[in-house]
Amino acid sequence: MRGKKVWISLLFALALIFTMAFGSTSSAQAAGKSNGEKKYIVGFKQTMSTMSAAKKKDVISEKGGKVQKQFKYVDAASATLNEKAVKELKKDPSVAYVEEDHVAHAYAQSVPYGVSQIKAPALHSQGYTGSNVKVAVIDSGIDSSHPDLKVAGGASMVPSETNPFQDNNSHGTHVAGTVAALNNSIGVLGVAPSASLYAVKVLGADGSGQYSWIINGIEWAIANNMDVINMSLGGPSGSAALKAAVDKAVASGVVVVAAAGNEGTSGSSSTVGYPGKYPSVIAVGAVDSSNQRASFSSVGPELDVMAPGVSIQSTLPGNKYGAYNGTSMASPHVAGAAALILSKHPNWTNTQVRSSLENTTTKLGDSFYYGKGLINVQAAAQ
């Protein structure tokens, strides 16, 4: 590869990017009792700071209220009151306010449809979430400051961008979230939320990188004992060196997954890109939420399996979230599924993991367009 510049491009098409608002604080009133009592917070005026806690409690009790808790640092108390007590307390000269004891909710965590579509929650409910499995996201880096991601390590092979934990493109961060966004009550949930993410930067801010950078990234993954490699990238040109790298990774026991490509159809010709085209790599095509092949998804005899890749919600740099389209979004579903399987069967070889994924798919149609079908990680992990 010396002296030969071969650039490889990202395999995703951005049809939609939007920031998601997850949940909101509710002002819903706690359900009232049959006698009309509801929960309130009664606050006292600053001029009453010398009044004893006992006397403040009496102020509420004398109006028919039932004090639940008197706060230590806030001059107020929670109480159960009926409408009459509320009116009388609002008139009391010692009372500053009487407000509803509103109900707040944890910010909602969304489970992207793709996670459910491949049956990952069934493994989660059994306690298998990817623990002790290392996944290398060979991509544009990962924004390690994102609250929905926990990045265990990484390296950069891009000479001009030496920080793997800074994603100047957004692609790698989005891919990482699909693999392993945390189960932390915010944002989104990844396929394998407890997997260990490693940011291996091989693509620059413009979404491209030389094959030599990718090969360096694969070698780093081998040397650092990664269990799974995800490459949501590809190019139209084959390379003996790139093939040797992925073959070596598989020979070393790594499950290697790559996007099939976003080249759609071209008559009866294969449009699957490299490295997905190599036999040692699991090439992943994209379907939508109805299991229909995405029009952009590459086709060919090298296509192995399908996974969700249309309007996939995931993490973005800057503590954001958004939806992307592409086989780049499908591939990390399979990488995450491999991590789930390995968390349940830590002694399985990469060959067993791949076979289990391919032999338990939901058949969707002609293998030229759909490979072996949609992965079902619940069945694959049996």
Curated annotation (Swiss-Prot):
Cellular localization per UniProt: Secreted
Q: How is the cofactor bound?
A: Binds 2 calcium ions per subunit.
Which keywords has UniProt assigned to this entry?
Calcium, Hydrolase, Metal-binding, Protease, Secreted, Serine protease, Signal, Sporulation, Zymogen
**What is the activity-regulation note?**
Completely inhibited by phenylmethylsulfony fluoride (PMSF) and partially inhibited by benzamidine hydrochloride, leupeptin, and pepstatin A.
Q: Could you say which residues bind Ca(2+) 2 here?
A: 276, 278, 281
Q: What class of enzyme is it?
A: hydrolase
Name the InterPro entries for this protein: Fervidolysin-like_N_prodom (IPR054399), Peptidase_S8/S53_dom (IPR000209), Peptidase_S8/S53_dom_sf (IPR036852), Peptidase_S8_Asp-AS (IPR023827), Peptidase_S8_His-AS (IPR022398), Peptidase_S8_Ser-AS (IPR023828), Peptidase_S8_subtilisin-like (IPR050131), Peptidase_S8_subtilisin-rel (IPR015500)
Domain Inhibitor I9 stretches = 39-105
Q: Catalyzes what?
A: Hydrolysis of proteins with broad specificity for peptide bonds, and a preference for a large uncharged residue in P1. Hydrolyzes peptide amides
Q: What is this protein called?
A: Subtilisin BPN'
Gene source species:
Bacillus amyloliquefaciens (Bacillus velezensis)
